[in-house]
């Protein structure tokens, strides 16, 4: 058995080496047949001697048993998006803002890979969990599929606990092979490598994912505590040493002109790459400076994504159709002769409003220029008057709603026409779609087509009716088998337990967004207390402006809305805030109410763990030192934050002092 154990270890080493050469370096030293022969030898050994199968075995790359569904998991820290820059002016404004806050700066420029963001968690050096970005707060667990990607190490070169983030993508070579195979089988082709990568990672059968030959570039570490890195560039070098694949086409530059030169280089050379990129990511390189700048609610202040100019194509405008949103806004949509734009076929594009149509002199029958805004949303940029046919038709918006026939109005200060009929069918359907959306009640399986069927069948007329649906209601619907019905009813039941902020946002109160819904839910705790609130009270709340206050009070005073809320209560839909009320956290006086900054490397816990513990004691953890900071906890190699705290006379604790205070509380 000792000989067999040695052979297993030898096979691991050889297969990992050959895999790295093929998938990462693109320079294989042995033919595919040799790799396959060794892999099958290892598979046979593991089948006959299961005790030799390890969690990091190369056979894991083949894929395992199919899953029933993907589990949703909360990210330890949110996967934020980046702010966008579309031109030189945007970049220079970003640079000016950076220099005004932190002075001299070095930037790290990296290629923006056009793929799917993923988060990879390692415990004691082993890959244990991989998530999609999802909505930034919650992602899907696609661990088994990610294990099939050879560029992802199943075991790091050091036994660290770490979470890294990167972009999974499909190389162009793999994409062409996949579509050739689909074409042979008379299957629908993927529009572009990004869609193919996303579809491949969401396969319930990881064996199918394994066949798609995906890859990944790692671009960040969630917690730098265990890294001897002072900068983004050093962190990427550390990741390379640990066995991760980072993109080597990166560059450190000393100023914004260097950034612009890097962008110019890769704008002209992007087609020479074996994978798609859709822009350039620019980051402040120094990690202390990143900490000093901090984050907005949606994105880091120290980074920005430059998006390549959108591809423009010419096609014919066949017609203009209207759609009505949940707030009654009537939006014109261009119906186009199908055309390829940025890798996908486009037959519809936004025209925004009537003023834009007239300002750009866009007529039905015109040749028009179409692009994708941010490479995502198709829009008509302009018409080409010199190619206009004689029978081109000037478009005029209707005076009445195409859905309900109610007269359309233009509210003062707005460019959009609006239907103000509260019983307009189109608005009601859009409101239902919003109610079940991810950031609202998040009811999986209740998509647009099912909502439309339910509404047309008069099974639902308002959002409360969703909670009255039965198996008998759902089974007759198109493409609704028993399993789908069971899953949908379970999702509806689960949605009853959502916190109050989800319900508030889902109700679609005009001007009330996700953040304001959270603020109101936390402050008033129950829907009953909110029903008694006045406009004067609301405007006193930070983050709630005049428009929101007026809209909320007007909405909740409506008798039909109060009846709707009662209807929801009758089905036991939760009306209470379930989150932690930050103002009510009863922490120790040593921490409660204090503003605390963490800086430097901590050895006895991660910075994330320290932040969570401080928050549990009622402290506010911030990323930058100001005159309002109460305490700075300084770990090893604390930099500019420590210096600033000393100059401001702020109380400073060492890591050991902080740990001692924790131990005092726990004793």
Curated annotation (Swiss-Prot):
Belongs to the NAD-dependent DNA ligase family. LigA subfamily. It catalyses: NAD(+) + (deoxyribonucleotide)n-3'-hydroxyl + 5'-phospho-(deoxyribonucleotide)m = (deoxyribonucleotide)n+m + AMP + beta-nicotinamide D-nucleotide. Residues 586-667 form the BRCT domain. NAD(+) binds at residues 32-36, 81-82, 110, 133, 167, 283, 307. It comes from Staphylococcus aureus (strain JH9). GO terms for biological process: DNA repair; DNA replication. One of its GO terms (cellular component) is cytosol. SMART domains: BRCT, HhH1, LIGANc. Zn(2+) binds at residues 401, 404, 419, 424. This is DNA ligase. InterPro entries: BRCT_dom, BRCT_dom_sf, DisA/LigA_HHH, DNA_ligase, DNA_ligase_AS, DNA_ligase_CS, DNAligase_adenylation, DNAligase_N. The keyword DNA repair applies.
């Amino acid at each position: 058995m000792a000989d067999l154990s040695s052979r297993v270890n030898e096979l691991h080493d050889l297969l990992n080496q050959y895999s790295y050469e093929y998938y990462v370096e693109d320079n294989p030293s042995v033919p595919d047949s040799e790799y396959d022969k060794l892999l099958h030898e290892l598979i046979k050994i593991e089948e006959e001697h299961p005790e030799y199968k390890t969690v990091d075995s190369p056979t894991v790359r083949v894929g395992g048993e199919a899953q029933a569904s993907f589990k949703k998991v909360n990210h330890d820290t949110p996967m934020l998006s980046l702010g966008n820059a579309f031109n030189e002016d945007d970049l220079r404004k970003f640079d000016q803002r950076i220099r005004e806050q932190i002075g001299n700066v070095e930037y790290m420029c990296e290629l923006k890979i056009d793929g799917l963001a993923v988060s990879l968690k390692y415990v004691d050096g082993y890959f244990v969990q991989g998530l999609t970005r999802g909505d930034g707060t919650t992602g899907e667990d696609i661990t088994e599929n990610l294990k099939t990607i050879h560029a992802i190490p199943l075991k790091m070169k050091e036994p660290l606990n770490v979470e890294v983030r990167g972009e999974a993508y499909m190389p162009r070579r793999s994409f062409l092979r996949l579509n050739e195979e689909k074409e042979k089988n008379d299957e629908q082709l993927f529009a572009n490598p990004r869609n193919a990568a996303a579809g491949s990672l969401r396969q319930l059968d990881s064996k199918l994912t394994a066949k798609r030959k995906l890859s990944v570039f790692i671009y960040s570490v969630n917690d730098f505590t265990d890294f001897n890195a002072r900068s983004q560039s050093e962190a990427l070098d550390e990741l390379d040493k640990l066995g991760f694949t980072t993109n080597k086409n990166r560059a450190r530059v000393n100023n914004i002109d260097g950034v612009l030169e890097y962008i110019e280089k890769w704008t002209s050379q992007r087609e020479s790459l074996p994978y798609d990129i859709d822009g350039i990511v620019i980051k402040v390189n120094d990690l202390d400076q990143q900490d000093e700048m901090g984050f907005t609610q949606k994105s880091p202040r120290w980074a920005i994504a430059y998006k390549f100019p959108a591809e423009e194509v010419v096609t014919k405008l066949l017609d203009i159709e209207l759609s009505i949103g949940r707030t009654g806004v009537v939006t014109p949509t261009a119906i186009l002769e199908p055309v390829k734009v940025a890798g996908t076929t486009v037959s519809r594009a936004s025209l925004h409003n009537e003023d834009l149509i007239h300002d750009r002199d866009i007529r039905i029958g015109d040749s028009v220029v179409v692009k994708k805004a941010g490479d995502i949303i198709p829009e008509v940029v302009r018409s080409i008057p010199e190619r206009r046919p004689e029978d081109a038709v000037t478009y005029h918006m209707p005076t009445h709603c195409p859905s309900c026939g109610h007269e359309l109005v233009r509210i003062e200060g707005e460019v959009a026409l609006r239907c103000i009929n509260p019983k307009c069918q189109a608005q009601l359907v859009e409101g239902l779609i919003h109610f079940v959306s991810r950031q609202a009640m998040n009811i999986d399986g209740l998509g647009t087509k099912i909502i439309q069927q339910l509404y047309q069948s008069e099974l639902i007329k308002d959002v409360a009716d969703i909670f009255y649906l039965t198996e008998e209601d759902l089974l007759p619907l198109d493409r609704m088998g028993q399993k789908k019905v069971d899953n949908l009813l379970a999702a509806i039941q689960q949605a009853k337990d959502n916190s109050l902020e989800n319900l508030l946002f889902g109700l679609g109160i005009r001007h009330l967004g996700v953040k304001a819904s959270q603020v109101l839910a936390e402050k008033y705790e129950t829907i009953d207390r909110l029903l008694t609130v006045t406009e004067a009270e609301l405007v006193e709340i930070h983050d709630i402006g005049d428009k929101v206050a007026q809209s909320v009070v007007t909405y909740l005073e409506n008798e039909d809305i109060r009846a709707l809320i009662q209807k929801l209560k009758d089905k036991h839909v939760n009306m209470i805030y379930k989150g932690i009320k930050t103002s009510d956290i009863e922490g120790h006086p040593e921490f409660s109410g204090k503003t605390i900054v963490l800086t430097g490397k901590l050895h006895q816990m991660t910075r994330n763990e320290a932040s969570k513990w401080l928050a549990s004691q009622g402290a506010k953890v911030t990323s930058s030192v100001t005159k309002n900071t109460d305490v700075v906890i300084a770990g090893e190699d604390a930099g500019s934050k420590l210096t600033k705290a000393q100059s401001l006379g702020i109380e400073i604790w060492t890591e050991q002092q902080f740990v001692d205070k924790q131990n005092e509380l726990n004793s």
